[in-house]
């Protein structure tokens, strides 16, 4: 992941500056860092590479944007990100290989698997329809 601070800095991600800012923020706290609540527990996939020929991958993403826009709240920055109350899924065209890149995260394993199934099924159909292998 990345973290950006736009105040008191140039507004790009910088790991060393991020660590220094966190140290500065927490140095003013009376409680130790161990008193902070833990990270939320979620189910998530690693980055999934779905084979998709270069010639059709951007058309597949375009179809995904139109399709999922009618079903869910979506963000179309760099692909399509489906946003649900219990999780999210991302589809984007790889810039370096003939593949679509997918990621899924949800509050539970079942919710993540449901979203993944819902998003992968039409992708496979569009890839086959446009001349790729599914």
Pin down the residues of each PLM region.
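Phosphate-binding and adjacent anionic-ligand microenvironments
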Residues: 1-103, 108-134
């Amino acid at each position: 992941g990345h973290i950006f601070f736009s105040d008191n800095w140039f507004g790009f991600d910088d790991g060393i500056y991020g660590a220094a800012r966190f140290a500065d923020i927490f140095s003013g706290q009376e409680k130790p860092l161990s008193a902070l609540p833990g990270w939320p527990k979620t189910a998530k996939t690693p980055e999934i590479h779905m084979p998709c020929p270069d010639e059709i991958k951007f058309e597949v993403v375009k179809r995904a944007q139109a399709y999922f826009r009618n079903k869910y709240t979506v963000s179309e920055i760099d692909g399509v990100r489906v946003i649900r109350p219990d999780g999210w899924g991302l589809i984007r065209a790889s810039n370096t290989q003939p593949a679509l890149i997918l990621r899924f995260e949800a509050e539970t394993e079942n919710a993540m698997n449901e979203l993944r199934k819902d998003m992968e099924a039409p992708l496979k159909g569009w890839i086959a329809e446009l001349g790729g292998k599914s």
